[in-house]
Swiss-Prot record:
The keyword Signal does not apply. This is Photosystem I reaction center subunit psaK, chloroplastic. Its main location: plastid. Keywords: Chloroplast, Membrane, Photosynthesis, Photosystem I, Plastid, Thylakoid, Transmembrane, Transmembrane helix. The keyword Phosphoprotein does not apply. GO terms for biological process: photosynthesis. The chain crosses the membrane at residues 3-23. It is found in: Plastid, Chloroplast thylakoid membrane. It comes from Spinacia oleracea (Spinach). It comes from the Eukaryota.
Amino acid sequence: GDFIGSSTNLIMVTSTTLMLFAGRFGLXP
C-alpha cells in the first residue's frame, strides 16, 4: 500500500514538473 502511494505521488510530481518545464520553454499553451 505504501509503495503504491509513493509511486502514485511520484508520478503526479513528475507530471507537474514536466508541465512546468513545458510552460517555461513555451512547449505548452
